[in-house]
């Protein structure tokens, strides 16, 4: 049995290695805020959230749409989905309580433990089957439709009756029937467990029916050695069936484990959705397109991590950057540029892992890699100057990127003077654009920004943090020519309370 709720045809691999730039992405996009909102204190949900979001960069369009449809079902049937998740968790936790039986070297102990676990699993599977019978019609996605169809096919009444019958026989309430052969030195070999005779006869028939000849012996209650030998004979006979039953419990356990893992992603999405809905923030399911289409347009896009930590409503942005490879963002200090850049990265990750996005509408091409190059504070761990450190990080990014990747730059190459920083940024941008890399660049380097503006490139767009005439920030971005000032005097007047 397979859940197949993350991919159409394979399981979700929780042991897969994270991207090499995982630490930088987490730091620069403040992903821990998103992960914690998905987990709500649950360590397992946290692990799945982190890996599902970061692994999403490798998803194709079909996988993204597949998950979107499943998530839409989850949002419409949240209580049912959480109930299924609870059943999976309870099954795994109950199995752990019986784990010591698996450590035994004795087949009899292993068999008894497997019977107890399988009895518990049967009860949990019946709960899943009941949910499928009652609620399958309320789910529309391909993933859940296939999941419930699998449950109905695999978990019919005949299956449960057969399992219960086998478990009842394996309890050996009337003893164990074993056949054996004589080997060398008259030692017993080829011990085989046999099915007990049919007990459908009436008690009268059992009394008067002639029985085949049999030879038997009894062991004294005090004969410990004889009892031990008899126990060993029994273990030889039931060894194969004990191992087979243990494998059956492992098979069902692996199903519940994967069901829990794959549903954990959707439970995390439900957790975030609930928090955003409580704050009145909009979400929508994005329209992903192929990498080469170069689409990036949205309405009301906001920073989801900021929204999760703020009490007041967050300002969203409307941008149409379709057919653009380069987006340069300039303008007033503390005008929302870095927040906007973070919202771009977060929305891309959320879209590609199959989530909703923090926007009224969103359409973008998928990227084959997402990288961040943010300015870093100087600290004692740096082995060289800030510019050398920036160039070293840029080299690492280049080593790992492919065509159709996306890079987010935040005030990069500003550790040197204006002219040198602009020249470095200029050379790097030209190289990236030649390789079909999409770039979002927040910068105060006027020569760099205006140099590209003067080129009148069709595949570039220039955004500016809006500033009102009285110096107030609207935290919205508008399309406009880069300016030579970042209005730092506004901050001076605000901090020191002087007149503008």
Task: Tell what function each PLM region has.
Residues 1-184:
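Conserved amphipathic alpha-helical "coupling/scaffold" segments
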Residues 107-110, 114, 234, 245, ...:
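Amphipathic alpha-helical coiled-coil segments and their boundaries
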Residues 113, 251, 255-258, 386-389:
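Alpha-helical initiation/capping and key positions within long helical/coiled-coil segments
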Residues 129-140, 162-163, 167, 171, ...:
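Long, hydrophobic, amphipathic alpha-helical segments used as structural scaffolds
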Residues 168-223:
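Structured, charged N-terminal subsegments at the starts of enzyme catalytic cores
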Residues 217-249, 253:
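Extended, charged coiled-coil "arm/hinge" scaffolds of SMC/Rad50-like chromosome-maintenance ATPases
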Residues 258-305:
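Charged, amphipathic alpha-helical linker segments immediately N-terminal to NTP-binding catalytic cores
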Residues 291-500:
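ATPase nucleotide-binding head domains, primarily ABC-like/P-loop NTPase cores
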